Swiss-Prot record:
Transferase in keyword set: no
Gene3D superfamilies, alphabetized: Aconitase, domain 4
Pathways involved: Amino-acid biosynthesis; L-leucine biosynthesis; L-leucine from 3-methyl-2-oxobutanoate: step 2/4
Protein species of origin: Clostridium beijerinckii (strain ATCC 51743 / NCIMB 8052)
Name of the protein: 3-isopropylmalate dehydratase small subunit
Source organism superkingdom: Bacteria
Subunit structure: Heterodimer of LeuC and LeuD.
GO process annotations (BP): L-leucine biosynthetic process
Entry's family note: Belongs to the LeuD family. LeuD type 2 subfamily.
HAMAP family recorded: LeuD_type2
Length: 161
C-alpha cells in the first residue's frame, strides 16, 4: 500500500492534548473529533488538510494521555500517515489499532519540510520526497501489523479473519 500527500510538519513532543484537546473528549464521533484535530497547535490544520496529506513530526509524537481519540481524529481528518523520528509507545499501538499508518524515520524527518509532497510505500518503508527528489528508508511494519493496517484497524482485522 502506498500513499501520496502534502506535508504538515510539527516539532518535538506533540502530545495527545494538542492533537485532540480534552474539551472534545465527551464525544466518540470521529467526524466531530476530526473537526478539532490539531487546533491547539495549528488553527488552520482542519481548513487546509486534504485527504491523503501526511503529518511529519520530530521525536515523541503522541506523548501524554493515552487516548484512542488522537489517532482517530488524525485519520478521520484525512491524514494518510504520520512519519516521526519516534512515537510515544501508546500512541503507536493506538494508531495501529485504528488503522492509521505510521513510520519512524529520523533521516526523513530531518530533511522534509512543510509543504513537501511525499509518496510513502508501507510495504517497503520507502519514503520518497517528490519535491526534493530524495528517498529515505523507514522501517516497514512486520507482516502481522501490516495486515491490521490493511484491514482498517484491529476490529476490521478480527472481523476478516
Amino acid at each position: 500500500m502506498s500513499v501520496k500527500g502534502k506535508v504538515f510538519k510539527y516539532g518535538d513532543n506533540v502530545d495527545t492534548d494538542v492533537i485532540i484537546p480534552a474539551r472534545y473528549l465527551n464525544t466518540s464521533d470521529a467526524n466531530e473529533l476530526a473537526a478539532h484535530c490539531m487546533e491547539d497547535i495549528d488553527v488552520d490544520f482542519v481548513k487546509n488538510v486534504k485527504s491523503g496529506d501526511i503529518i511529519v513530526a520530530n521525536k515523541n509524537f503522541g506523548c501524554g494521555s493515552s487516548r484512542e481519540h488522537a489517532p482517530l481524529a488524525i485519520k478521520t481528518a484525512g491524514v494518510s500517515c504520520v512519519i516521526a523520528s519516534t512515537f510515544a509507545r501508546i500512541f503507536y499501538r493506538n494508531a495501529i489499532n485504528i488503522g492509521l499508518p505510521i513510520l519512524e524515520c529520523d533521516e526523513a524527518v530531518k530533511n522534509i519540510d512543510a509543504g513537501d509532497e511525499l509518496e510513502v510505500d508501507f510495504s517497503t518503508g520507502l519514503i520518497k520526497n517528490l519535491t526534493k527528489s530524495q528517498e529515505y528508508q523507514g522501517e516497514a511494519f512486520p507482516e502481522f501489523m501490516q495486515k491490521i493496517i490493511d484491514n482498517d484497524g484491529l476490529i476490521g482485522y478480527i472481523r476478516n479473519r
